[in-house]
């Protein structure tokens, strides 16, 4: 698919007068259209709900847009629970899917009524001892092990993942939970990441639906929901095609009718926990070129770095780059596009063919709406950037200010050194 930026050079020049680069900017129109399409794709299931993966983009202004389309929150930590609660997301609208979970996080999840998704069979006893009881509704995360394949193509390796119950543990766990008074059960599974195929969800659904039927038959458990989690990806590269969410929803419906309905389980709700799919395409990291270097390679230095977008440095991930104002110029120059960290992997692109770039140019790095700002950090004392929302009417709203040196040094505020720092630097 063609990768086009949702901002222009003229727009960014105007925005940068008020909000200096680098910054993440999100497209409200795109977010809304996508959320609406997802809701429509699963409208056939009466209980369907998307629990947005807060870890992907933990910004309340963006999450509140999704809430207008019925989305809840998928949380994996205490602070994500705290944020969701502060936003007014309550009870069953929060799914707490965690692993290696500290006791206090279970306590808080139970306190605010979140649905708890257990990652391990030993967590049954741990949860009961921690909060003094077991909730009437609980979910268990399933990991079948081995390789997960679609049409003989290996998609991922669940057997190497730290998450979830084995098949045997699912049956044992359900029996234990039922004996302890749990009344409503859920099944959760995440078996592949960033899949760019319409077949992932239907294939996963078949495996989970068939498991659900067996669990019901062998344990008598009342299964009220099946959570397909995340895994629907996006086309980061121009040579990839996007998923068709309507085809995906229809594929899941067909399997639902084939497997669950004949088993008398036609009332089971379908849940999803999408993050990347909901937000990634609708975010850009906008940065300005501040240096060029001509040595063994041609380098373009920008004012953003891996602090602002970690994925290329951490995973070698591809993020498309648009040189704003030069969209129609030939990509006949080969560059490494770099940040200023003291790490050689701080590169947004390596040997990337781009138009001729000049100091002062603005660059839009695509698909940063999920796992972009969220994965930021402060190595080298670098500060995280602002987040902006491009509204449907064309106006721009600040939805998170940029960090300041005072933020960076805040945890020293109880020590004498804090008062000696020159905050006017």
What kind of feature is each model-predicted range?
Residues 1-136, 175-179, 183, 217, ...:
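A charged N-terminal "starter" segment
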């Amino acid at each position: 698919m063609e990768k086009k930026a949702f901002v222009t050079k003229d727009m960014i020049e105007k925005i940068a007068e008020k909000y200096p680069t680098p910054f993440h900017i999100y497209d409200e129109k795109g977010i809304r259209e996508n959320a609406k399409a997802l809701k429509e794709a699963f409208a056939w299931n009466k209980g369907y709900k998307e629990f947005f993966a807060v870890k992907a983009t933990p910004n309340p202004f963006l999450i509140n847009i999704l809430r207008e389309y019925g989305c809840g929150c998928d949380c994996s930590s205490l602070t994500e629970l705290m944020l969701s609660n502060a936003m007014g997301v309550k009870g069953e609208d929060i799914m707490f899917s965690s692993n290696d979970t500290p006791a206090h996080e279970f306590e808080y999840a139970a306190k605010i009524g979140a649905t708890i998704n257990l990652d391990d069979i030993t967590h049954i006893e741990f949860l009961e001892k921690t909060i003094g009881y077991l909730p009437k509704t609980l979910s268990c995360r399933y990991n079948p092990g081995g390789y997960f394949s679609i049409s003989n193509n290996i998609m991922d390796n669940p057997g190497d993942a730290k998450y979830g119950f084995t098949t045997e543990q699912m049956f044992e766990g359900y029996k234990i939970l039922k004996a302890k008074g749990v009344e409503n059960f859920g099944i959760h599974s995440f078996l592949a990441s960033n899949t760019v195929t319409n077949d992932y969800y239907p294939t996963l659904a078949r495996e989970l639906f068939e498991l659900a039927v067996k669990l019901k038959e062998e344990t008598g458990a009342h299964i009220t929901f099946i959570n397909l989690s995340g895994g629907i990806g996006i086309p980061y590269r121009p040579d990839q095609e996007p998923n068709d969410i309507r085809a995906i929803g229809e594929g899941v419906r067909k399997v639902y009718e084939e497997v669950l309905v004949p088993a008398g389980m036609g009332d089971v709700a379908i849940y999803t926990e999408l993050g990347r799919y909901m937000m990634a395409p609708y975010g850009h990291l906008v940065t300005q070129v501040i240096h060029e270097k001509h040595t063994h390679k041609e380098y373009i230095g920008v004012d953003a770095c891996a602090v602002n977008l970690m994925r290329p440095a951490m995973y070698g991930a591809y993020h498309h780059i648009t040189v704003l104002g030069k969209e129609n110029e030939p990509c006949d120059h080969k560059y490494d596009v770099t940040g200023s960290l003291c790490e050689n992997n701080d590169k947004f692109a390596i040997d990337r063919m781009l138009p001729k770039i000049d100091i002062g140019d603005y660059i839009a790095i695509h698909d940063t709406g999920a796992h972009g700002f969220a994965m930021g950090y402060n190595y080298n004392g670098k500060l995280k950037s602002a987040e902006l929302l491009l509204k449907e009417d064309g106006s721009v709203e600040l939805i998170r200010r940029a960090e300041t040196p005072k933020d960076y040094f805040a945890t020293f505020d109880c020590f004498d050194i804090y008062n000696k720092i020159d905050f006017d630097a």
